[in-house]
């Protein structure tokens, strides 16, 4: 679990967000280390708990709240031969040019080469004449 700060209006348990990097005001903020220092650009986070601590912030309409976040499970298309529940693999994105499936082919929050654990097989999906498995994965750190 990671402690960070989010805008007061976004501080709701269950909310997911992608961290894209620091804003200009963050570079001189005294809270930057706790706010953005624990987050990795391009990763998806899910708020699991909102604490009753707030701080002023010029970026987030006046206030930020202290929250606890985790990286959630993410759905991604995978070659069927690698889709084994419980296995850990190095993520390799499939080739699929269907715009409707873009978020499943290269979901935000995951990068090519990430070590992931396959949690669940969700569905069979066809794309470009090929059959893939839609799986739910969790990124392994370290």
From Swiss-Prot:
The UniProt entry, under InterPro entries, shows: UPF0179 (IPR005369)
A Pfam family in this protein?
UPF0179
Transmembrane annotation, as ranges = none
- UniProt-listed NCBIfam families: PRK01177.1
Q: Which HAMAP family match?
A: UPF0179 (MF_00498)
The record's family statement is:
Belongs to the UPF0179 family.
The protein in question is named: UPF0179 protein PH1477
Q: What is the organism field in this record?
A: Pyrococcus horikoshii (strain ATCC 700860 / DSM 12428 / JCM 9974 / NBRC 100139 / OT-3)
């Amino acid at each position: 679990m990671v402690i960070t700060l989010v805008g007061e209006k976004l501080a709701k348990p269950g909310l997911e967000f992608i961290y894209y990097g620091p804003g200009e005001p963050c570079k001189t903020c005294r809270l930057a280390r706790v706010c953005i220092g624990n987050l990795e650009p391009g990763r998806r986070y899910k708020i699991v708990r909102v604490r009753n601590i707030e701080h002023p912030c010029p970026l987030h309409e006046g206030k930020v709240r202290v929250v606890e976040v985790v990286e959630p499970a993410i759905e991604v298309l995978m070659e069927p031969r690698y889709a084994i529940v419980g296995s850990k693999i190095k993520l390799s994105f499939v080739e699929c040019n269907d715009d409707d499936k873009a978020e499943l082919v290269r979901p935000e929050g995951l990068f090519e080469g990430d070590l992931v654990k396959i949690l669940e097989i969700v569905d069979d999906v066809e794309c470009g004449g090929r059959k893939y498995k839609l799986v739910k994965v969790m990124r392994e750190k370290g």
